[in-house]
């Protein structure tokens, strides 16, 4: 039958996500280092997440909420818009098992523009909407991960459906015997 999102502990979820990101940097460092499109990176990460979360579906750019398009309310803009999350870990057709939602940004360390910062702010606003259970049609994701991918490190902000909680992780490639592959 599988595991529900309420049976997995946060520390186990965080470990699985970090293991997937480590695998991405190890096996696919070439696409990160050579400025390949962000969608290519998210696709590869989704594969590694699927290997970790075998009882779940892992989808990229998935825009359905049951039979309806996925929408969230943007409080700052007072609008309700369709959204296309970068990656989700969920069980299709079961809103009660929406586990993790990812928004991912690839960052060129030498060229952080105002547009990049504006897009990052918008992605974080979307994440808060995904985990906010007070929306008109709540999506009820348990965790929202904002992942910023740099050539030599990554940065994660984790949002919980309990608005008072947030976790931050920064990992440099030299940390924890972190290794890269040139393949």
Regions found by a protein language model. Give the residues of each.
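Conserved catalytic cores of phosphodiester-cleaving nucleases, focusing on short active-site segments
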Residues: 86-89, 98-110, 127
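Surface-exposed cleft-lining segments at the edges of enzyme active sites
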Residues: 28-34, 74-76, 108-114
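Short secondary-structure junctions
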Residues: 49-58, 138
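Active-site metal-binding core of divalent-cation-utilizing nuclease and nuclease-like domains
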Residues: 57-95
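Nucleic-acid nuclease catalytic cores
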Residues: 131-162
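Non-catalytic C-terminal interaction segments of nucleic acid-processing enzymes
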Residues: 166-183
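Mg2+/Mn2+-dependent nuclease catalytic core
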Residues: 109-131
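Charged, often low-complexity linker/regulatory segments
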Residues: 1-50
């Amino acid at each position: 039958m599988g595991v529900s999102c309420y049976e997995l502990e946060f520390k186990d979820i965080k470990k699985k996500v970090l293991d997937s990101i480590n695998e991405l940097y190890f096996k696919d460092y070439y696409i990160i280092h050579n400025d390949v499109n962000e969608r290519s990176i998210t696709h590869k990460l989704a594969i590694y997440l699927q290997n970790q979360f075998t009882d779940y579906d892992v989808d990229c750019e998935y825009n359905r909420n049951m039979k309806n398009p996925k929408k969230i309310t943007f409080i700052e803009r007072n609008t309700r818009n369709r959204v296309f999350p970068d990656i989700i870990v969920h069980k299709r057709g079961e809103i009660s098992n929406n586990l993790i939602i990812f928004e991912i940004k690839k960052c060129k360390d030498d060229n952080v523009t105002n547009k990049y910062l504006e897009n990052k702010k918008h992605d974080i606003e979307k994440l808060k909407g995904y985990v906010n259970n007070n929306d008109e049609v709540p999506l009820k994701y348990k965790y929202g991960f904002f992942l910023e991918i740099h050539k030599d490190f990554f940065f994660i902000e984790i949002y919980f459906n309990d608005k008072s909680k947030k976790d931050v992780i920064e990992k440099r490639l030299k940390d924890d015997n972190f290794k890269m592959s040139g393949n």
